[in-house]
Design a protein with these regions (language model features):
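Terminal (and in a subset, N-terminal) low-complexity or junction segments at the ends
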Residues: 1-150, 159-566
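Short glycine- and Lys/Arg-enriched binding-loop motifs that mark or flank ligand-binding interfaces
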Residues: 156
């Protein structure tokens, strides 16, 4: 006989003492819907008066069957009976709203709680809800008003800022955490190191590393990998190698991070050597390893090695290629001018090629003036972001199809797609200075432009000729040259020269890929100034020294040198 039948046939006095037990039995038998039905029957056929334990069971049932509407009804009952100050009830109710992305209802529940509860647990739940949706501003409003903040609160905000690319905010929050008197843990350090890596904040990253040693936090494989990644992305690849080599037992993720770091610096031969060490040590590579290996091959023009790795991952390690493996392989072939082979690989892929793969092929079509294949490739890309429109416009302008290029910009404007502005930045004295093309907003603008004009003059005396063919607008030669002269990375270099002494290494970060003109200019300037200039663009690092680049000019043209750190 079911509990519902019992309720209908037996007097209330026989059922009432066992009401919660009946409900709990339904839950334990894996029938949360039945629990809700039994409760409804009790309310309908008896004068049963639920207590806080009843509501705890009801909320557990709502959680198990994801019934948000029943949750809202229970919330209403709780308000009427005055149980919204019970800790055992408020937490599951809040979590139910957050799990179902009902943050408005969660806020209505949370704000009154601040009058009687200082427990950071509930605030941390709210932070989790907003950060899950990427709403850092709303999470910060919760964070500011939390009466008590524990380490979970700070870690949530720092990690959320990193995930939403608010890197300066992440570093500021970490500094505030340190000043609050709480001791950062491994999660705190790994999050802020990720922010330093992505922002290229070398000075801040070094301070964080020193603080790790002072605090005495245990350096597990996640923290070691974070340190390797941070130093590499801040232009200190030799320090990354030093940290990597200091670890006796290396986790797979640490090997992968080191290989990826070397790949980002274009150190192809070092990548090959490190992978051999990895195999000899008995560590079995995974799919991430081979993405890094193939990326290194793409950066360094190592076509044969790429073919070998692509074959080895399936034949030796039984790793099925994913779209990112195909993408790296297509990029390797495309950059080497093997467009037909790259296209054939795309057409034979076991998975559907994504837009990234088609863009790699399309970019190579522009570089090698393969307009027919370019037209075929264009049809496969539905322009989504500004990068797609820019690439398509550049292809047309490179073959003097100015009308078609202009049509692309008109279409972009019509669809209200905003072009991503190129930004470059440098970190000096612990503070970051950001520049955009033609930027005049800096307090030292007059001095920066004076230095830049001087550098341009010296570069031309050494043979630099502006690559005006790279300007994608049909304008005069003078306008083209002026357009190239004040690119953001040139301004960043001029600022660094202005603010640092002779011989000081210069590190410039850029959110887009550097243009060929700035690449050639920096080669010459490194020779003129007798300085090392390291430029980190969207794809990789370029180390300019004595008139040469570590990419061997492969990323732009051909020829050059390679250095090693292993």
């Amino acid at each position: 006989m079911s509990y519902t039948s019992c309720l209908k046939k037996h007097p209330m006095r026989l059922i009432f003492p066992y009401a919660n037990s009946i409900l709990r039995a339904s839950l334990e038998k894996g029938s949360p819907q039945k629990l809700l039905m039994d409760y409804s029957t009790m309310r309908h056929f008896t004068t049963f008066c639920p207590d806080y334990r009843t509501y705890v069971l009801l909320l557990r049932a709502c959680s198990k069957c994801s019934d948000i509407y029943a949750t809202m009804q229970i919330h209403s009952h709780l308000t009427k009976v005055g149980l919204l100050r019970n800790q055992d009830i408020i937490a599951p109710l809040l979590r139910l709203y957050i799990d179902h992305d009902r943050m408005m209802e969660a806020c209505e529940l949370y704000w009154p709680m601040l009058e009687w509860s200082t427990d950071p647990f509930h605030g941390n739940l709210m932070l989790m809800g907003f950060l899950k949706e990427g709403q850092l501003d709303k999470a910060y409003q919760i964070f500011k008003r939390m009466p008590v903040k524990d380490l979970v609160s700070w870690n949530s905000m720092i990690a959320g800022a990193v995930r939403t690319s608010h890197l300066k905010d992440a570093m500021n929050l970490f500094s505030r955490l340190v000043n609050s008197g709480l001791v950062p843990d491994g999660f705190s350090f790994s999050s802020v190191l990720s922010a330093c890596a992505r922002a290229g904040a070398r000075c801040y990253g070094v301070w964080v590393h020193q603080l790790m040693d002072e605090v005495g936090v245990e350096k597990n494989h996640l923290l070691i990998s974070a340190l390797v990644d941070m130093y590499a992305k801040c232009g200190r690849i030799a320090v990354s190698v030093e940290i990597f080599n200091s670890v006796k037992r290396k986790h797979l993720s640490t090997w992968n991070t080191m290989i990826s770091s070397l790949a980002g610096h274009g150190l192809g031969s070092d990548v090959v050597m490190l992978f051999r060490r990895m195999e000899l040590s008995g560590v079995v590579p995974d799919g991430v390893t081979f993405v890094a290996l193939l990326t290194a091959c793409s950066h360094c023009g190592m076509v044969e090695e790429a073919r070998q790795y692509f074959e080895t991952m399936t034949s030796k390690y039984s790793i099925t290629p994913k779209v990112e493996h195909y993408g790296a392989m297509v990029d390797t072939l495309s950059r080497a001018g093997l467009l037909d082979e790259a296209y054939n690989l795309v057409m034979s892929m076991a998975v559907k090629p994504d837009a990234v793969i088609w863009r790699a092929l399309l970019s190579a079509c522009r570089r090698y003036h393969q307009t027919k294949l370019g037209d075929v490739t264009i049809e496969q890309i539905a322009c989504q972001g500004s990068g797609d429109y820019t690439l398509l416009s550049n292809i047309y302008s490179s073959i003097n199809r100015w009308d078609d290029s202009e049509e692309v910009w008109k279409e972009m404007k019509k669809k209200k797609v905003r072009k991503i502005k190129g930004l470059s930045w440098v970190e000096l004295g612990g503070s970051t200075r950001e520049f955009k093309a033609g930027d005049r907003s800096h307090p030292d603008s007059d001095d920066i432009y004076r230095v830049l004009h001087c550098l341009l003059k010296k570069a031309k005396a050494e043979g630099y000729t502006p690559s005006t063919e790279l300007v994608t607008k049909d304008v005069s030669q003078e306008e083209r040259e002026e357009n190239l002269s004040f690119h953001s990375e040139k301004l960043a270099v001029a600022y660094s020269v202005l603010k640092t002494g002779p011989g000081t290494e210069i590190l410039v970060s850029k959110n887009l890929q550097a243009c060929g003109d700035c690449h050639e200019w920096m080669k010459i300037i490194s020779k003129v100034l007798c300085r090392v200039i390291i430029m980190r663009d969207r794809v990789r690092f370029h180390r300019f020294e004595s008139g040469c680049c570590s990419c061997k000019d492969y990323w732009i043209n051909r020829g050059g040198i390679e250095y090693s750190v292993i």
